[in-house]
Each structure stands twice: as structure tokens, then as C-alpha cells.
A protein has these predicted regions:
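Short functional hotspots at interaction and active-site rims
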Residues: 1-159
Length: 159
């Protein structure tokens, strides 16, 4: 965080991928037995979840089918994150190439906010990474195997 900045103004934006084959990574079994769990091989279309973490929690969340690209990130900035920005906000992004496409900075700066990029290879500086990890654990526990079940589990994980 920049010295002298108000931490309440920071919005850490990041994306994460989801699919229909999420399963718990660890389990328990009686002594001498192995844990077994079936996981589907076909996971369907991946789902990308993008959101902004503030001191008040996760906000401005959007899900989309497939991977994040410049066009979908521009839609997120204009229609989802943009309306939540007020002059003086600081939008913190990692160094994903999609975040650095020409015109993205102008979408944020037009709202009176400013962009701040994390140093390369520094996910530890973005608290949203840990937030996504906790929420994805809840999704693994839910083991949604249909898109509808994933949406329902996602709503519970984001609540």
C-alpha cells in the first residue's frame, strides 16, 4: 500500500477460474483404507469469476463463460466495477496482459479513480488471492456437477 493512502479506498481486482469437476483435495478414511472419490473427466466450459475486494468484503462480482479477455474485462470495468468507483479510489490489478490493454486505464480514470499495478510475481500483496482460495474451498465442498448447481454454490460462497 502506498504511504499516506486511505486503505478504505483500495479495490483489489482479480479473476479466478471455476469448472464442474471441483473436488476436495484431501479427505479422511478409516485406518488402513484409502479415500476414493469419482471426479468427472469432462468439465464443460470453464467459468471465470472476477471481483473486487475492499475492506468491506467482495463486491462488483461478475461471472462469465470461458476465459477473461480484453473485451470482457472492458465490460467488467464499464458496467460492473465502474459504477462502484468514486473519485479517489485506487484500483489494484496484477500484471495479467488483459489488464494492460490500451484504453483500460482510461475507463478507470474517467471515474476519478486511479490504477495501481502490483509488482510482477507478487500475489502475496493481493488479499483477494486468499479470499478466492477460501471461496473455492467452499465450491470444492459443494461438488457442483451442473452449471445450475455451480451457480447455486457460487451464490452461497459469495454470501
Amino acid at each position: 500500500m502506498a504511504r499516506g493512502e486511505d486503505s478504505r479506498r483500495f479495490k483489489f481486482v482479480d479473476e479466478t477460474g471455476l469448472h464442474l469437476a471441483f473436488a476436495r483435495r484431501y479427505g479422511r478414511a478409516p485406518g488402513g483404507q484409502r479415500v476414493g472419490q469419482g471426479v468427472p473427466l469432462r468439465v464443460g466450459t470453464p467459468v471465470t469469476l472476477i471481483g473486487a475486494l475492499t475492506v468491506n468484503g467482495l463486491e462488483a462480482v461478475m461471472s462469465l463463460d470461458g476465459a477473461l479477455n480484453a473485451a470482457s474485462f472492458a465490460v467488467y470495468l464499464e458496467q460492473v466495477l465502474g459504477p462502484t468507483l468514486v473519485p479517489g479510489d485506487v484500483v489494484v490489478l496484477d500484471n495479467l496482459p488483459v489488464h494492460k490493454v490500451a484504453g483500460m486505464a482510461q475507463l478507470v480514470e474517467a471515474r476519478g479513480a486511479r490504477l495501481l499495478f502490483l509488482p510482477p510475481y507478487s500475489p502475496d500483496f493481493a488479499p483477494i488471492e486468499q479470499d478466492w482460495s477460501k471461496r473455492k474451498t467452499a465450491l470444492r465442498t459443494a461438488q457442483a456437477r451442473t452449471r445450475e448447481a455451480l451457480e447455486q454454490a457460487l451464490n452461497q460462497a459469495l454470501a
